[in-house]
Amino acid sequence: MKKIFCIITCAILIFTIFAGCSAERLSFTGSDYSIPELDLSTLPNEYKNTEYEYLYELSVVDNSKDYLAHPDSVLLKNGDILTMFPEGHGKGAIKTKISTDGGLTWGDGIKNSPSSWENSRETPTVYRLCFTDGVTDDNLIVISANPKWGDEPTDGGFNCSVSNDEGKTWTEFETFYDINSDTPVIPIVAMSSLTQLKENGKFVDKWMGLFHDAEFYNYKTILTFDKDGNPNWSAPEKYFSQYREIEQKSNMCEVEVIRSEQGLGNRLCLISRSNSKQMNSLISFSDDEGKTWSYPVEAPAALNGERHKAEYTNDGRLFITFRSIERGKKAEENATRNDKNGWVSEGWIAWVGTFEDLEQGNEGQYRIKLAHIYKDRQRKPNYCANADTGYCGNVVLSDGTIVTSTYGKFDPKDRIDLIGTLKTSICSKRISLKDTDVLVENMKNNP
């Protein structure tokens, strides 16, 4: 009798647990994308030993630790690729790697990097600064915020370090707008974008940097240099206050800015992460160099995601990488009982389209699943992937080849403990759109 009672009790308990999970699950309120998605996670037999096989290959940037993440990259004038990342999840000493062969292999990075980089508290972002006087050499700039991590104290503000010799040497970090300044901020992901500005239709030596804070206020600050070449940043100001209701509902953050006409035009497009995941990424436009922005609209499902990074390709198209966030019916059908938040991720995704697609609200041409990012104890590629990926370093080589780097769990056999936790590494992939165009066309002709 006691045995029967125990069985019934256990059955009731199990039912209660699963019923509770089902009741707590948020609904999938988004839509599905309808453009093709090219899956480069597994090499099909028909492309083995062909000119397309490279599209399915990954190069290891760094797998020397159990967890490395959040890379950013810049193309050097000699064709080398410099990639930077923190030694940890979102923070830690800045580490670097350099590829001298177009992303095929990665070797040692910067020698004798600044000692202040050891105390970096966030994901570093790196940009090239092209001056307009025809005399001043390009600078490279690394920026790293000082956010608040849990109970750890922070002085806030953001740090920047400058190189005027193509990354061989760097200044020590200089901090701007910490808690002791007249305009204190505690930024997150500074700068998620850095855009050279125009005045009277011509580029000037001013750059607009964007970041957000823990309350999802979004800020801009303008970078200039004094006559001695020292960086100055204007006092951060909120640039989206006019749309505070939707900014807050979306938990808008990690904004990428894209300039029209292959980076030469007069219109700016903003695309953001919606951290609430209860609405899609937001898109907004500015025709006055970021002084004002149009009413934000939700991006098409094909572009919905987090930490968008955009580059123009040699043929004028846009290649935008991001962490996929899927909120539609297909996502709901593929979700497991553990996916209770109204979304799932396909992992590391790239979108191929045009600036006009962004303006017109089109879905674009196609998406690319660049590799499968495994969940712990997931043994083979699946529609649902690990969402801990998608912060990318993207460069376009002179021959048009795209080299994109991200982080994630790429190998289901690379376990770091007995319970099946997988190693998180940084890898890169080479992409040529003329080749992915062919594969997508083959998909359409052979559904």
Task: Kindly give the residue locations of the regions a language model identified.
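Asp-box/BNR beta-propeller blade signature and adjacent active/binding-site loops
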Residues: 26-447
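Sec-dependent signal peptide cleavage junction
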Residues: 17-28
